[in-house]
Amino acid sequence: MTKFSQNIDYLRNKVFVPGVVLSTLYSPGLSAKTCIIKYLDGEVRKILCPTGLKPGNSVLTGIEIPIALGNHLLLKNLPLGTDIHNVELYPGCGGKLARAGGTFANVIAKEGSYVTLRLPSGEVRFISKYCWATIGRICEKNNGKKALYKAGQNRWIGKRPHVRGVVKNPVDHPHGGGEGRSPIGRSHPVTPWGRIALGQRTRKSKRYSDLLILSRRK
């Protein structure tokens, strides 16, 4: 995906420097659109475009600023029920969560040093109240539902043709080999590296962040 490097500003660290949306752009390597922001000091950056943000609108990053579309704030300053995207996992690391087209997280509770968020996957977890997030939902709400009119549309976003393991040679895949249309010869499908596929959970056990997850993803 280095071919489609976008240089998108996920950190949004221009604190208290107003910016104006110049235009919205289609980005071939992303499922969401981006927009060009020109800040008051003359710097130009590209950010993810939330639904409803149009050329001429202003955006701002700050601690106690208006709750407006496209503004970037600390989680502790967001009211309950706010839809957000580009959410940090740890303070100062840049947005990591809810960045795909049509996705958003929701602020559902505040307690102590943590804010409780419902993520796009359905997972409910604690995140530090000192993490930053951007207000609004990512545009392209029909992401994943549009019918493709040519194979090249998948190639634009980095998806290449997928070959089934059962039609490969046994040296290339555990499902391979046999005469004609033969079964895989196993009780359960596996990955090319021999691990159980289709339903097996791959998250490592005993991770430190397990204590922060209230409800696992659906």
Swiss-Prot record:
Keyword set, alphabetical order: Chloroplast, Plastid, Ribonucleoprotein, Ribosomal protein
Recorded GO MF terms: RNA binding; structural constituent of ribosome; transferase activity
Transport as UniProt keyword: no
Cited Gene3D superfamilies: 2.30.30.30, Nucleic acid-binding proteins, Ribosomal protein L2, domain 3
Gene Ontology cellular component list: chloroplast; mitochondrial large ribosomal subunit
GO biological process: mitochondrial translation
UniProt region (Disordered), positions on chain: 165-192
Keyword Plastid carried by entry: yes
Subcellular location: Plastid, Chloroplast
Family matches, as NCBIfam families: rplB_bact (TIGR01171)
Subunit record text: Part of the 50S ribosomal subunit.
Sequence similarity: Belongs to the universal ribosomal protein uL2 family.
Protein name per UniProt: Large ribosomal subunit protein uL2c
